[in-house]
Amino acid sequence: MQKPLAIFLMGPTASGKTDLAIALRQQIPVEVISVDSALIYKGMDIGTAKPSKAELELTPHRLIDILDPSESYSVMNFREDALREMADITAQGKIPLLVGGTMLYYKALLDGLSPLPSADPDIRAEIEAKAEQIGWAGLHQELVNIDPISAKRINPNDSQRINRALEVFYISGKTMTELTAQQGEAIPYEIMQFAIVPQERAVLHQRIEQRFHKMINLGFEQEVRRLYQRGDLNVDLPSIRCVGYRQMWEYLEGQTSLDEAIFKGICATRQLAKRQITWLRGWTSEIEWLDSLDPENSYKKMIEKVQQKHLKLW
C-alpha cells in the first residue's frame, strides 16, 4: 500500500519559507503545519516573525499559538501533535506541508524518538540542589566527564538542557548520546524534502539584520516588556530563551543597553541560521535545494517536482 505524501519545506530563519508556502497553497492542495519551536507561543508574534493575520487568513498554519509562554513543549509533544494534524489533513484528501526551521522536530518526525526516560521530579530536584552549590557551569563540567559529545552541544549556561542530560544518565545509566543514537518508529508517510537557503551567506546576514530592525520598529521591545511585566516568566523558560527575546529580556533587567540588546539579538539570530544550515548540510535524507534569492524559480521547481512524483493528484 502506497504511503500518503507529505512535504517538508525547511530552511534557516529569514530564508523566505513562509512566502513560498503561501504561494504553494494557491496551486497545490496542501495544508501548512508549522515546524517552529517559537511560533507555538501565544503573545510572541513580532520577535518570532509569526505570519501576519492576513497571511494566516490566506494560508492557515497549524501548531501556531497553541501554548502560553509559561508552558514547556517537548520534541515528543511536537511529534504527537504533528502526526495528528498530518492524519487529519490526509483524511481531507490534502497534502501536509510542514514549514519551519526547527530541525530537531523534523528529525524526530523522520526517524522517530529515541527511547529517552521520562522526567523524574526527585532526580531533577537533586540536580537543581547541586546546581545551587556548584553552579550550572560546574554541572556542565560534570557532564563533560560523563557525556562529552552532549556537553559540547550544550551551552554551560543552559540549565534546562544540562539538567535533562544529567537526569537521563542518572535514570538510565546511559548517556544522552548513546540513547539518541537508537532510532524509534519512522514516519508513516512518503516525504518530499525541500530546503530553501540563500547561496550567499552575506545576503542572509543582511536580511536578518533588516528584519530585526523592522521588528524593533513594529514594537518588539513593547511585546517583550508585556511578557516581562507578567511576573511569572523568566529567562530559563524555553519561550524567553528564543533568540531576540533573551537579549531584550537582559535589556529590561538592566544588564545591557537597548542598542547592545539589538546587536546581540542580530548576532544570536545569525548564529541560529548558521546552526540551521549546518543541520541541513549534514542531512542524511535526499533534499531538493532551493535558492531563496530566486523565489520564482524555487516555486516553479517545487511545483514541478511534486507534480512529477504524483501526477494523478491533480
Swiss-Prot record:
Binding site for substrate: T13, A14, S15, G16, K17, T18
Cofactors (names): Mg(2+)
Catalysis: reaction(s): adenosine(37) in tRNA + dimethylallyl diphosphate = N(6)-dimethylallyladenosine(37) in tRNA + diphosphate
Gene Ontology biological-process entries: tRNA modification
Region listing for Interaction with substrate tRNA, in residue ranges: 36-39, 160-164, 241-246, 274-281
Site (Interaction with substrate tRNA) location in chain: T102, R124
Keyword tRNA processing: yes
InterPro entries: Dimethylallyltransferase (IPR039657), IPT (IPR018022), P-loop_NTPase (IPR027417)
Enzyme Commission number, as recorded: 2.5.1.75
Pfam families listed in its UniProt record: IPPT
Organism superkingdom: Bacteria
Signal sequence segment: none
Keywords for this protein: ATP-binding, Magnesium, Nucleotide-binding, Transferase, tRNA processing
Binding-site residues, ATP: G11, P12, T13, A14, S15, G16, K17, T18
GO molecular function, one term: tRNA dimethylallyltransferase activity
Keyword Nucleotide-binding annotated: yes
Function description: Catalyzes the transfer of a dimethylallyl group onto the adenine at position 37 in tRNAs that read codons beginning with uridine, leading to the formation of N6-(dimethylallyl)adenosine (i(6)A).
Quaternary structure, from the entry: Monomer.
Family: Belongs to the IPP transferase family.
Protein name as it appears in the record: tRNA dimethylallyltransferase
Source taxonomy: Bacteria, Pseudomonadati, Pseudomonadota, Gammaproteobacteria, Pasteurellales
